[in-house]
């Protein structure tokens, strides 16, 4: 036995000897220690703040193999000065004042294994911060020279017995963590020691061996132990907050160099040092970076023989490895990480101890490495702080407030009363907010940030104590703002104690409704420690009865909580990066996720079902959005029955469910893709739902084959809205530049060739993805726009806009907003029904109903027997999300029906006058990152964006008569409002790079602040005369003695050193040094402005870094890189340098006391002009006389008389705006515009004018034009007639004609002969049209297109004369013109010509005759001609706007392009033998003398609550607006047109218009082709004189070739030549609201052949017959079996069992319960309760009388029928019983 022990001892001694080759027995090694940690904005200035450290380190090996150490003579020096050579600067000792560092000088021991330091043993009374500094020093000796912990890598090489050269990676423990470390070991030439003796000061002791260099580089990205604290980096992409690199704004690197002498078996560590550098872009936007550099250098001073054994430790404590140890807030004593881990996992205790014992006696390095790797996980797992308790402040490690006071929390300082300090800060902030300007000089927002930090240190009782004080002060009126400041700060704390207190405040009604909602929203956004206990308590709060009873609070609670759930439990990456997981462990726990699946989602599901059963639309919308916020795949189980028609909800709610699955697409793209693609694939689904599914599908990054299938299907899909969405999103995805979208971009590019060639407008379904990438800036902007226009309106019913940026690798959600509505028209209808005007018009119509003629709309509806097509009830939402703050506004028809009462209540409040005071402090963004530096000192980076919004004042408003009267909305005649208020907004972006020295509780800091302050006083009175269309706003100027800052912006870089416990703003601390650049490098400005023009004096002053950037630079970058290039050019000139800009109001130099703004608007239809002959362009003197009138109405009258002169049947519009400043002197400015335009008369005039009454200067831009109408139905006439347009323009300004500058111009626009020849000889549509014309069809699509093409004006000839222009302006214009020459070189030709005259410029513009894709521009001035040729116009929008047309003006062309209308407006044509619908569908038509409905306006309306369904006849008879157009064939080539309409403009009367062919075959402008009678009275008109009715509401006039055009304002116009008729829609009114030969005018051309019984036929003959008023009755009463109703949606399975994680179940008995139906007498009757139905064959049936609910055969009825046929089970339990029906019911199944 004893021999065995002896053998073991010998083996152990030999192992100890071989495992410590750097340390010789009985020898003491003395090293000098030098360390420094400095922080500064090194790329801005050489100013630094930091600390130097010096000491001696004594090391010697013990007999037991441990390395014993001791530190002596420790001292430190504080640095706050300029260092010309940066952090490396050498400072003489004479210039440094060192202080003794109270660092433990007691011995410590290092446990070695094969030369590696495994554990540190210190005296038990060692302080934690001391232990960490010791670790930082001894970490320099952590050298794995043999690759003991090497990571497997085929490229690695290891030392041999003879040579130490090697390259390999290890996982190494040092003070900064357990990180991957790259070793590069190689020999150095020995001669280097001669020139660099410091690298090996004891080189003489080298003995045998080499000079060896060891280079180590740490890879923090790959680490197993990351001592750190981080918060707010949830949106960081592909990175870890403690990694080597985070985005493009954070760099962390650590490099070590050691010099050894000797050989592998015995060597001496001569010197070693490590440089740890952290570089941060302070506010993520500047190009300059700040840094913290930490360096530790250990150099061998001497080697001494040791005469005695090292002394033993009196009270040893093994504190584990060298990794930084977290401190305890209440106790700064060092503690063992061993004990912590044993407590966490006691089962590993025995195995760990056995493993350590076994390791001491291993002999082979290779076998040791192998066995170590094969063993169980290491005992020293990453340390964690105990999970925060709800009632206690969390023990956040590394933060200055937690470790800054000698390693303890600053709360432990008896002189630091946290409650009192918080109260003091709140009071200071409150006092400063009262006087807004003080917030600048007092740095109020800095104080608020400090306040938030202190509140996070408070326990529950601390917060409760201060809250009671603040609340009582507010109640007693002592302090107005203290409560709101503290309330907001507690919400920002985001801790458990904050949550518990906020919960109590709500329960005790300290905060309620909107105030409570804002607090909850902030709390959820700022949560820092979402433990399971915290999340459950938050859920309890969100589901409390008291919360649920307050609608706003309930909504915010639910939405905020579900957002937080997603962040913590669903998005794993965000959860890891957002919260301090390296300090407290992961919050993404299994229990937490189970809680979401088993409690949260089921609760929301239950609430959704309850809301659906109660028809509570607002709650339904909120619950859908809340489920979408969570984004877990389990929400599919909730939505599945509604998607697939098993349960009944409105189609709008189904749409919203799809729209709210955005986060599901982000987190579970594979599952989401399957669901969205199935929804998209279902062509019987509603188009808007499919469009939203396409948008969500793109979010899920679809694979290339899926996009290709979708692209190919656009050539087949019948729903053009969906095709438009697919095409737009694929085409925009092809243009994405960001690398993040590379996969999507490639997939889209491969799918693009497969897309349909059809062009769609932006006003159709449109999904646009766009990004702007500025690589140098590290900035990307991503924009998503989605819109979907319904069939009833060009205005989108779905709109969505998202903007987020990737800033140096940080994704930041800036804005997400949008809205959805079930029906735009229903919204307008519901609002209109609330008005008194509606009641009056309805009454007026009721009185006229009895006078309707036989062809009235209602009578025709009776004969047609239309089947009513109802809409769903109105539903709508508007939502917005800024950062993490989400708000949803929901309304429906019932909400709007309460609008009059809501307005009445508000009117009552504002009539009495309302005081308002809103003060809100908020952190828009917060980030914090802390970890130990190489010196063992905690580094901290913080980024804060606090803002203050303050709005205070009083408002009083009065409407006469009241807007809400008798529960109806009325149009007031007068409105007056008085408001006196001040709006103040202050914001700060603040960034600190700091570190803490716990031994003297100092914090060293480099910072950068960017401040913005805006304060606007408002003292105004508004008086509006609605009836006269006049408004006046008076602004009173405050009489004050001191200057008032309105805008103030500063950028301030600085360095600082201060006490950790200081609670004053950094800028106000004594040792803060603002970094100011040299004055010569800055541009200073100081000027006054405004007094000359307004009598108000403003001063602007400040300074900024000199920038050298010119216009040419920006143009160059725009050409090369577009917007991103300009950004980069501007950004390159930005910096973190000190700058300032201020705008102030100077009352002492201002004479104005009141400013008055007046606006007058007037519009009228003028049959005959006051002056028959057109007046010439005004001279300046004539203009002056017309503007001399003081009264706006008089000025308007004079101007209208002028612009309307000589123009028949003109619509005159005029606006006059004046601005007066009254005081010691009166300043007055007048600006206005007027326009006169006629539909028939070619003359028109536009005028803009301005007058400065003080300087007696006036000016005007007047344009007179002559634009004749063109022919509309005959291509030959259009080609034979030369279309042309003339413009005459004059711009002038000055005192009088003698000194005023003047620019005159004339332009003539025409169609070139080349254009005409191209159309005739080369355009393929010309020959198609001519063939159709031979068949007497003149206006089918080909001819329509050609007729429009024939009138484009591709040639422009112009001349410009100018005089008395300012020479500087002339030089500028000449410079710009020369720039254009250079820009378009070599497509420029310059030649000399004979002079065109002085001050004259003339030339031509010729567009390419074929397709206008190129343009030639000729400019002649003086004696030179410049030709720009073949200038590209590939942009379709540009071509649309630039190439003029005499009929379709620019606005009309733009609208047509946006709507995808090839001919700019939708048209319907009844030609000789063929007709065309509004959807461009053509078919054969054969009319007879029987009147046939071409177009009848039959709007869809939702049923009004409480009313029974009415027939179409009843609805149209009561409708205040009706239109019907009938046509009959009276002869072989002759048709007659009958139009009946009523409108409020007709006073409810039905107006009958008849258009008959003229008996005279020779038609012309003076001899029109038709005879028109209105209500039996013949109309007289020609091409310049209009015949009108109802004050211009109906207008009739002739076109140049005699065609007759009839216009109905804001509805349609009709062109008729006796043989054919073309109806053109001019607004949204007719969309999806017509029946007749023109089709349905919906976005679905496949339903154009809908007959009055509301089914679709394929037989065009029967389609035409069904709309014959008399003959069609028999066919309408017995529709063909081939006539099929359009029923959408048809449901299908979109969620598979795997997607939804659920299985469908059936009844065990073989039966299922289903609703049934029967069809009788045009009704469909549904069973109110489901009946048993056999899955297999029926064995026995019984006959029963079953209660049923019957519905007329409407779309709704067929929808339910289709739903049941597909296996759905709609809920009829709440429907009334119509009758009973006998049915056979299954009693038993086989």
From Swiss-Prot:
It is found in: Secreted. This is Vitellogenin. One of its GO terms (molecular function) is lipid transporter activity. SUPFAM superfamilies: Lipovitellin-phosvitin complex, beta-sheet shell regions (SSF56968), Lipovitellin-phosvitin complex, superhelical domain (SSF48431). The gene is VTG. Keywords: Disulfide bond, Glycoprotein, Secreted, Signal, Storage protein. The keyword Transmembrane does not apply. Residues 1466-1675 form the VWFD domain. Glycans are attached at residues 219, 297, 554, 573, 893, 1345, 1416, 1430, 1480, 1699, 1735. It comes from the Eukaryota. Disulfide bonds join 1468-1638. Residues 1-19 form the signal peptide. Precursor of the egg-yolk proteins that are sources of nutrients during embryonic development. GO terms for cellular component: extracellular region. Residues 23-799 form the Vitellogenin domain. Residues 342-353 have a biased composition (Acidic residues). Residues 378-389 have a biased composition (Low complexity). The keyword Heme does not apply.
């Amino acid at each position: 036995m004893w021999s065995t022990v002896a053998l073991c001892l010998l083996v152990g001694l030999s192992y100890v000897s071989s495992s410590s080759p750097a340390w010789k027995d009985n020898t003491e090694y003395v090293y000098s220690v030098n360390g420094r940690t400095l922080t500064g904005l090194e790329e801005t200035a050489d100013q630094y703040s930091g600390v130097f450290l010096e000491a001696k380190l004594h090391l010697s090996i013990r007999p037991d193999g441990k390395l014993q150490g001791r530190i002596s003579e420790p001292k430190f020096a504080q640095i706050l000065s300029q260092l010309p050579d940066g952090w490396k600067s050498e400072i003489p000792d004479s210039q440094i004042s060192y202080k003794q560092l109270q660092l433990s000088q007691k011995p410590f021991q290092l446990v070695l294994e094969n030369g590696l330091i495994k554990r540190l043993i210190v005296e038990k009374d060692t302080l934690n911060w001391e232990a960490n500094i010791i670790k930082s020093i001894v970490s320099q000796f952590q050298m794995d020279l043999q690759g003991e912990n090497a990571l497997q890598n085929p490229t690695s090489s290891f030392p041999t017995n003879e040579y130490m050269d090697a390259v390999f990676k290890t996982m190494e423990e040092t003070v900064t963590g357990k990180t991957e470390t790259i070793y590069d070991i190689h020999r150095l030439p020995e001669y280097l020691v001669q020139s660099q003796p410091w690298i090996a000061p004891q080189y003489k002791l080298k003995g045998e061996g080499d000079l060896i260099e060891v280079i180590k580089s740490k890879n923090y990205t790959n680490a197993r132990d990351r001592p750190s604290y981080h918060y707010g980096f949830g949106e960081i992409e592909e990175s870890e907050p403690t990694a080597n690199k985070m985005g493009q704004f954070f760099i962390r690197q650590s490099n070590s160099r050691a010099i050894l002498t000797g050989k592998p078996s015995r060597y001496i560590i001569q010197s070693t040092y490590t440089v740890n550098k952290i570089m941060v872009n302070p506010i993520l936007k500047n190009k300059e970076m700040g840094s913290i550099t930490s360096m530790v250098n250990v150099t061998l001073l001497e080697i001494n023989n040791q005469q005695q054994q090292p002394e033993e430790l009196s009270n040893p404590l093994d504190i584990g490895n060298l990794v930084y140890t977290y401190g305890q807030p209440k106790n700064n004593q060092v503690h063992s990480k061993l004990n912590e881990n044993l407590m966490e996992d006691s089962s590993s205790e025995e195995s760990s101890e056995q493993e350590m014992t076994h390791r001491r006696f291993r002999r082979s390095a290779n076998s040791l490495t192998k066995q170590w790797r094969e063993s169980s996980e290491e005992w020293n797992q990453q340390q964690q702080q105990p999970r925060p308790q709800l009632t206690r402040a969390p023990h956040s490690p590394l933060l200055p407030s937690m470790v800054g006071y000698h390693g303890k929390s600053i709360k432990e300082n008896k002189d630091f009363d946290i409650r009192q300090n918080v109260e003091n800060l709140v009071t200071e902030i409150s006092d400063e907010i009262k006087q807004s300007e003080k917030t600048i000089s007092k740095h109020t927002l800095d104080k608020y940030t400090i306040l938030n930090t202190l509140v996070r240190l408070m326990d529950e009782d601390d917060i409760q104590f201060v809250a009671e004080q603040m609340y009582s002060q507010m109640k007693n009126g002592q302090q107005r703002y203290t409560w709101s400041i503290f309330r907001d700060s507690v919400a920002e704390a985001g801790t458990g104690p904050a949550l518990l207190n906020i919960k109590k405040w709500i329960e005790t009604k300290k905060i309620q409704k909107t105030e409570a909602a804002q607090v909850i929203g902030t709390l959820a956004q700022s949560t820092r420690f979402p433990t399971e206990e915290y999340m459950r308590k938050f859920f309890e709060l969100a589901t409390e009865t008291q919360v649920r009873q307050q609608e706003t609070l309930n909504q915010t609670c639910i939405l905020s909580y579900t957002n937080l759930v997603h962040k913590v439990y669903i998005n794993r990456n965000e959860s890891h990066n957002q919260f301090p997981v390296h300090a407290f462990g992961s919050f993404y726990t299994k229990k937490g996720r189970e809680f979401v699946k088993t409690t949260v989602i089921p609760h929301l599901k239950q609430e959704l079902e309850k809301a659906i059963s109660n028809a509570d639309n607002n709650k339904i919308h909120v619950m859908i959005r809340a489920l979408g916020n969570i984004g877990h795949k389990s929400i599919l189980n909730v939505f599945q029955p509604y998607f697939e028609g098993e349960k009944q909800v409105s189609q709008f709610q189904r749409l919203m469910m799809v729209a709210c699955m955005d986060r599901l697409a982000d987190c579970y793209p594979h599952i989401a893709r399957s669901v969205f693609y199935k929804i998209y694939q279902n062509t019987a689904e509603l188009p808007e739902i499919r469009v939203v599914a396409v948008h969500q599908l793109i979010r899920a990054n679809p694979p290339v084959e899926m996009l290709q299938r979708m692209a190919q299907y656009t050539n087949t899909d019948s729903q053009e809205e969906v095709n438009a969405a697919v095409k737009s999103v694929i085409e925009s995805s092809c243009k994405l530049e960001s690398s993040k979208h590379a996969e999507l971009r490639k997939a889209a590019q491969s799918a693009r060739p497969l897309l349909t060639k059809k062009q769609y407008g932006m006003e159709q379904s449109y999904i646009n993805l766009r990004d702007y990438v500025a690589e140098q800036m590290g900035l990307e902007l991503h924009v998503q726009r989605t819109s979907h226009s319904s069939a009833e309106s060009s205005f989108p019913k779905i709109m969505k806009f998202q903007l987020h940026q990737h800033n140096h690798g940080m994704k930041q959600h800036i804005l997400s907003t949008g809205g959805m509505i079930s029906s735009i028209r229903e919204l307008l209808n519901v609002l209109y029904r609330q008005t008194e005007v509606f009641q009056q018009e309805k009454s007026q119509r009721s009185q006229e109903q009895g006078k309707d003629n036989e062809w009235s709309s209602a009578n025709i509806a009776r004969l047609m027997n239309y089947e009513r097509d109802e809409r769903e009830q109105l539903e709508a939402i508007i939502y917005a999300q800024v950062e993490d703050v989400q708000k949803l506004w929901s309304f429906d028809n019932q909400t709007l029906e309460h609008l009059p009462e809501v307005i009445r209540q508000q009117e009552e409040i504002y009539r009495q006058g309302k005081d308002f005071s809103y003060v809100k402090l908020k952190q828009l963004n917060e980030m914090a990152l802390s970890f130990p530096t190489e010196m063992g000192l905690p580094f901290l980076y913080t980024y804060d964006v606090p803002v203050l919004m303050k709005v205070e004042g009083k408002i009083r408003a009065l409407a006469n008569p009241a807007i809400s009267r008798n529960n109806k909305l009325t149009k007031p005649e007068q409105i007056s409002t008085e408001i006196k208020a001040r709006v103040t907004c202050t914001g700060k972006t603040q960034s600190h790079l700091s570190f803490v020295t716990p031994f003297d509780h100092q914090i060293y800091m480099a910072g950068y602040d960017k401040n913005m302050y805006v304060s606007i006083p408002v003292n105004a009175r508004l008086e509006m005369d609605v009836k006269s269309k006049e408004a006046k706003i008076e602004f009173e100027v405050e009489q004050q003695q001191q200057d008032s800052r309105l805008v103030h912006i500063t950028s301030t870089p600085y360095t600082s050193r201060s006490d950790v416990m200081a609670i004053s703003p950094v800028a106000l601390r004594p040792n803060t040094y603002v970094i100011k650049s040299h004055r010569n490098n800055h541009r200073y400005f100081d000027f006054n402005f405004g007094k000359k023009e307004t009598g108000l004096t403003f001063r602007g002053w400040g300074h900024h870094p000199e920038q050298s950037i010119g216009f040419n630079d920006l143009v160059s970058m725009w050409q090369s890189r577009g917007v991103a290039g300009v950004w980069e050019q501007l950004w390159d000139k930005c910096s973190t340098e000190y700058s300032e800009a201020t705008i102030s109001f100077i009352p002492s130099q201002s004479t104005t006391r009141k400013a008055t703004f007046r606006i007058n608007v007037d519009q009228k239809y003028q049959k005959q002009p006051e002056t028959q002959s057109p007046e010439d362009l005004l001279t300046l003197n004539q203009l002056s006389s017309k503007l001399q009138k003081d009264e706006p109405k008089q000025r308007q009258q004079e101007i209208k008389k002028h612009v309307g002169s000589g123009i028949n049947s003109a619509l005159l519009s005029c606006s006059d705006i004046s601005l007066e400043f009254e005081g010691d002197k009166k300043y007055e400015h007048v600006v206005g515009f007027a326009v006169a335009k006629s539909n028939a008369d070619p003359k028109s005039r536009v005028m803009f004018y301005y007058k400065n009454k003080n300087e007696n200067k006036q000016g005007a831009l007047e344009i007179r034009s002559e634009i004749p109408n063109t022919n509309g139905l005959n291509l030959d006439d259009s080609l034979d007639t030369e279309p042309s347009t003339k413009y005459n323009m004059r711009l002038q300004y000055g005192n009088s004609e003698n000194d005023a500058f003047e620019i005159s111009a004339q332009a003539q626009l025409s169609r070139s002969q080349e254009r005409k020849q191209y159309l005739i000889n080369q355009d393929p549509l010309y020959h198609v049209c001519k063939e159709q014309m031979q068949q007497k069809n003149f206006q089918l699509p080909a001819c329509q297109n050609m007729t429009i093409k024939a009138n484009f004006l591709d040639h422009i000839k112009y001349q410009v004369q100018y005089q008395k222009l300012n020479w500087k302006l002339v030089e500028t214009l000449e410079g710009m013109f020369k720039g254009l020459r250079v820009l378009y070189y070599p497509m420029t030709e310059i030649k000399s010509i004979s002079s065109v005259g002085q001050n004259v410029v003339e030339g031509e513009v010729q567009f390419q005759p074929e397709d206008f894709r190129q343009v030639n521009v000729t400019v002649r001035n003086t004696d030179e001609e410049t030709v720009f040729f073949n200038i590209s116009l590939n942009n379709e929008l540009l071509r649309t706007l630039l190439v003029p047309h005499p009929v379709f003006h620019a606005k009309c062309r733009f609208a047509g392009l946006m709507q995808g209308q090839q001919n700019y407006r939708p048209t319907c044509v009844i030609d000789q033998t063929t007709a065309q619908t509004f959807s461009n569908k053509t078919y054969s038509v054969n009319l007879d003398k029987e009147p046939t409905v071409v177009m009848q306006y039959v709007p869809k309306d939702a049923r009004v609550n409480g009313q029974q369904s009415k027939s179409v006849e009843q609805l149209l008879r009561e409708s205040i607006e009706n239109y019907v157009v009938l046509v009959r064939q009276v002869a072989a080539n002759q048709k007659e047109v009958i139009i009946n309409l009523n409108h409020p403009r007709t006073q409810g009367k039905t107006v009958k218009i008849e258009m008959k062919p003229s008996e005279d075959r020779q038609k012309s402008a003076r001899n029109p082709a038709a005879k028109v009678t209105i209500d039996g009275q013949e109309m007289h008109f020609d091409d310049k004189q209009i015949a009108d009715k109802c004050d211009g509401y109906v207008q009739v006039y002739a076109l140049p070739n005699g065609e007759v055009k009839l216009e109905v304002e804001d509805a349609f116009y009709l062109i008729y030549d006796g043989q054919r008729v073309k109806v053109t829609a001019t607004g949204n009114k007719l969309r999806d609201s017509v029946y007749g030969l023109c089709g349905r005018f919906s976005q679905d051309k496949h339903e154009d052949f809908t007959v009055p019984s509301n089914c679709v036929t394929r037989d065009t003959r029967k389609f035409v017959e069904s709309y014959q008023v008399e003959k069609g009755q028999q066919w309408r009463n017995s529709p063909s079996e081939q006539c099929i109703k359009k029923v959408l949606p048809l449901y299908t399975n979109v969620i598979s069992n795997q997607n939804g994680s659920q299985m469908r179940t059936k009844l065990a008995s073989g039966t299922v319960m289903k609703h049934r139906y029967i069809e009788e007498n045009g009704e469909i009757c549904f069973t109110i309760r489901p009946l048993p139905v056999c899955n297999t064959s029926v064995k026995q049936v019984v006959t029963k009388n079953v209660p049923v609910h019957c519905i007329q055969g409407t779309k709704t009825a067929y929808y339910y029928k289709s739903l049941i046929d597909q296996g759905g089970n709609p809920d009829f339990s709440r429907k009334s019983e119509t009758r009973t029906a006998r049915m056979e019911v299954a009693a038993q199944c086989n």
